[in-house]
Amino acid sequence: MEELSLNGTKTGAVGHGINGSTNLLWVQSNMVERKDIINGITIAVISPLFASEKEILDAQNKRVATIFDVSTPEELERIRPEDEQAPNIVVNLLDWQVIPAENIIAAFQNSQKTVLAISDNTSEAQIFLEALEHGLDGIVLKVEDVEPILELKEYFDRRTEENNVLNLTKATVTNIQVAGMGDRVCVDLCSLMRPGEGLLIGSFARGLFLVHSECLESNYIASRPFRVNAGPVHAYIAVPGGRTCYLSELKSGKEVIVVDQQGRQRIVIVGRVKIESRPLILVEAKIDSDNQTISILLQNAETVALVCPLQGNNLLKTAFPVTSLKVGDEVLLRVQGGARHTGIEIQEFIVEK
């Protein structure tokens, strides 16, 4: 038998349950002294595991998982929830990956068993964790170095971030002014947005306005619920990890966060970015607890709107079009630290105006 433990592992691996299940960390003996492998870990209890043929056993020689190699449809058909006594199933998909993973998720959706997939890189692991929307229960990451483990940890951190509700602040509009022409950015996403959802945009990183999507119906133009008319190229946009980037830096494949009126967020992928010269309007606002002015420039068009605060249980009013925005109207802001270095918040003195 091959012992999978801190003292005798021949390949590094990490098993991570995406829905809060037990985390298993298997590392090479020459990785143990690497400080970065335990970065962020306060206390760890590690249970040695043993691989014997197609089974994984614990220290008491009890089977805790069964390993299945899958390279044909027939081998996939043999994996059935009712046939296995072990609580965990580990699949090694040697041929196709996406469709077999989806079939396994469908077959085990009402089962109490945990299904993990073996992967040798983070990109492959992401495929398994996102298959059929729900993903498999976890990953056994079989690697020779610690970097893919840290990459997978970063992926889980980003997904966990989606469960955190952002604190949005009410701000009162103090000035509205036609500004002239500029290069504005339309951000087209790979996901649809609902009324009340949009992207966090602003001229200053310290205050980002919640800019509504073009999901609302109009008599003159079809709704585009995948699009946010986001503002000029210089503006900041919120991206995962508490970071910002410039609108001009966005491109296909980048991730941004979609936020609703209540601060709930989700990570979405940018499908396309359009930059065109359009007339702009300047909107300035202040929050009651701060005398600083926070501003945003947006295209001067009826389809561009700022999300407003919830009014009690009234879910009908979601946004003010910039063309009908008035001084005194209330909009939603995300207030945060203003000093940034490559999009990362830092502590330093800065003046933005």
Give, region by region, the residue ranges found by the protein language model.
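Phosphate/adenylate-binding glycine loop and adjacent helical scaffold
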Residues: 244-247, 328, 334, 345
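Generic structural signal for buried aliphatic residues
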Residues: 185, 250, 256-257, 328-333
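Glycine- and charge-enriched low-complexity intrinsically disordered segments
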Residues: 281-339
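Short, surface-exposed secondary-structure boundary micro-motifs
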Residues: 242, 255, 261-262, 336-337
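Short, well-ordered loop/turn sites that connect or cap secondary structure elements
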Residues: 231, 247-251, 324-326
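N-terminal intrinsically disordered, low-complexity, charge/repeat-rich segments that act as generic
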Residues: 49-53, 58-216, 223-225, 242
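Short, compositionally biased
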Residues: 264-285, 344-353
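N-terminal basic/disordered segments at the start of proteins
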Residues: 2-50
